[in-house]
Structures are given as structure tokens and as C-alpha cells.
A protein has these predicted regions:
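Basic, polyanion-binding surface patches
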Residues: 1-119
Length: 119
């Protein structure tokens, strides 16, 4: 998997840390019904993941130790293979080491040009 992150973003800061536990993280594919949750994580000065997920059902990934919302379309636990600076972004190349869940139905949350279009 490849993730492209703005260098000045909180996720880039976290994934750049050499102390990241076992160099592992999780990605949740959110459903169209989870715009509010996406907004919490996208906001500047946002609280920690633990606080952002305070009123949202979640689990701790067994392989990554990351907090994972329970109601997305899918969750992936990943291990960092390589970090590549690319202009004003950081590319994180990772191996998927686990798939805690996938949903049977649901529409994905997509952000395009600052909006959430419906497919």
C-alpha cells in the first residue's frame, strides 16, 4: 500500500517518527455516513486519536496497536517498508499485515476537491 501525506500534516509527523511502535499503523476506509469522523481527523489542532474516537465504537489493532473505528468499510493494519520524501509530501510504502474487518455493504467516503461527492 502507498500513502501520500502532506509534510506538514499530523499523520506525516507520526509516520516519520523512528519510535513508531514496530513501525506499524492502521488505515480505516470510511463509509459515506462517516463524514463527521473524517472531519475530526482532518481538522487542524485535532485531538489525539483516543479523544477523536471517544464516542465512536473502536478497537485496538492486534498487529499494529493502533485505534481502529469499528464501523468503516474496511480496516487495514500495515507495516512501514519505506518512506520517500516527494516535494511537499511524504510517501509511505507499507505492507498490509492484517485486515481486521471488511463490511458486506456500504458506500465509500470520497473527498475530491474539498468536497464529498456521492457516487
Amino acid at each position: 500500500m502507498l500513502v501520500s501525506l502532506a509534510l506538514d500534516s499530523y499523520p506525516a509527523e507520526v509516520l516519520s517518527r523512528p519510535s513508531l511502535p514496530a513501525q506499524r499503523f492502521a488505515v480505516t476506509l470510511l463509509s459515506a455516513a462517516q463524514k463527521m469522523l473524517a472531519g475530526r481527523f482532518a481538522a487542524e489542532g485535532r485531538p489525539s486519536a483516543r479523544l477523536a474516537l471517544d464516542d465512536v465504537p473502536h478497537v485496538r489493532g492486534s498487529l499494529s496497536g493502533a485505534l481502529i473505528p469499528s464501523e468503516g468499510l474496511a480496516a487495514l493494519e500495515c507495516s512501514v517498508a519505506r518512506r520517500v520524501p516527494a516535494g511537499d509530501h511524504l510517501l509511505v510504502i507499507a505492507s498490509v499485515i492484517g485486515v481486521p474487518y471488511t463490511a458486506e455493504t456500504g458506500d465509500p467516503l470520497i473527498r475530491f476537491r474539498g468536497r464529498y461527492p456521492v457516487l
